[in-house]
Design a protein with these regions (language model features):
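Active-site phosphate/pyrophosphate-handling residues
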Residues: 9, 91, 158
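Amphipathic alpha-helical dimerization/coiled-coil segments
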Residues: 75-122
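Basic helix-turn-helix/winged-helix DNA-binding cores
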Residues: 1-87
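Generic structural signal for hydrophobic core residues of well-folded globular domains
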Residues: 14, 96-100, 163, 167
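A structure-centric signal for secondary-structure junctions around beta-strands
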Residues: 60-61, 93, 147
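Mid-protein regulatory/catalytic core that forms ligand/cofactor-binding pockets
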Residues: 107-177
Length: 177
């Protein structure tokens, strides 16, 4: 996952009231191997601060609290990536959309971002198909792997397009503008 998107996702998650790395793992599916280094980076950047607490099992655990700068970034940091180029990682795209929705982004902006990500995936899938068999011969390991990648990109593109359509349909008329 893109580091900046992971950082935004973690900040947004803490802005929703969660406090620990364990919460990130349990409720958001972020592994401790990803979240702990990200939390250290966020703490070094003064976006979160750690509060050691003794839990019910008398073990020390770290609760995290957003600083003013962290709260500001959590609520507005998604704008640049959303309006800029789509992150390549499918998980990053979904997490960025989650952050934007939490921050009450305009439906049109989120849907346009999803459409662009879907288009990029379709384009990648098309370019992945051109000439693959001529270069590698009959269907072998490389051709099978490439065919799988093309299928995955097509499925992701379809999902992102359907998600954009769903957002547009659910949004009240005033929020679409």
């Amino acid at each position: 996952m893109n580091r900046s998107v992971l950082n935004l996702f973690i900040l947004s998650f803490f802005d929703r009231g969660f406090e620990t790395a364990y919460d990130l793992q349990r409720h958001a599916g972020v592994s401790l191997g990803s979240s702990l280094p990200a939390l250290r980076r966020l703490e070094a950047a003064s976006l979160v601060k750690s509060k050691p607490q003794v839990g019910s099992s008398k073990r020390l655990r770290h609760e995290f609290e957003l600083t003013a700068a962290g709260r500001k970034l959590a609520r507005g940091g998604w704008i640049a990536p959303l309006k800029g180029q789509s992150p390549g990682n499918f998980d990053s795209i979904l997490r960025l959309v989650d952050v934007a929705q939490h921050c009450q982004a305009k439906v049109a902006d989120v849907a346009a971002f999803l459409d662009a990500a879907s288009s990029a995936r379709r384009s990648s899938a098309r370019s992945g198909r051109t000439g693959s068999r001529e270069k590698r011969g009959p269907l072998g390991i490389m051709a099978t792997r490439e065919a799988w990648s093309v299928s995955r990109l097509q499925a992701e593109a379809g999902f992102l397009a359907a998600l954009a359509k769903s957002l547009r349909q659910k949004a009240p008329r005033s929020a679409k503008r």
